[in-house]
Amino acid sequence: MSTVGAGIPEPPRDEPNSAWLNDTELEWVRGRMPLLYVEAVPVRVDGLGVVTQVGVLLRANAQGEITRTLVSGRVMYGETIRDALFRHLEKDLGPMAFPQLPASPVPFQVAEYFPIPGLSAYVDERQHAVSLAFVVPVTGTFEPRQDALELTWVTPAEASSPAFHAELEGGRGTLLRAALASVGVLG
């Protein structure tokens, strides 16, 4: 990879319009600016639209520990928020999850992750990131893919407990609590 101007990397020559960054490019960008992410709290709802179950993923983190987390991922250059949200829901939950994206995708919260603990409730050791967080009803069947090991369904009361929040990485317990409050089911 060569650089242009003041150390700005050129896009890979084999894919000049690629929206993906290789590991070197991603590390370079992460060290210089916040990245935009979407996060989703998958939920099941009853006939009146009341949340009856909350889905959380089980994953192995970079240290090899098994932790709970939410659907999450970067927004690619040129990608709409709606498309990024759908892509990450399908990537993590499988193609038959059938997420019900809202007509107007407005996040319940904007979360700002910092690599330094204490600057906000949200921590990501790799980077400074801004995440748009959504509650998304899903109606299909689930086959966790990529690095997700399992999707666990819990009641809103279970998802509201401090012990459950402690199992979520990077402050996502706080984000889950805000999600539950946004749909009126904080236990």
What are these regions (language model features)?
Residues V41, V51, E90, P115-I116:
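A structural signal for the main folded, soluble domain(s) of proteins
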Residues M33-Y37, G49, E65, L70, ...:
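Short connector loops at helix/strand junctions that flank enzyme active sites
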Residues G94-T141:
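Active-site segment of metal-dependent pyrophosphate-handling enzymes
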Residues Q63-R68, Q127, S131-G187:
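Nudix hydrolase/Nudix homology domain
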Residues S2-G47, V123-D124:
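Acidic, metal-coordinating catalytic segment for phosphate/diphosphate chemistry
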Residues P42-R44, L58, V138:
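Residue-level signal for short segments within beta-strands and strand-turn junctions
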Residues A40, L85, F134-V136:
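A structural signal for short, well-ordered beta-strand segments
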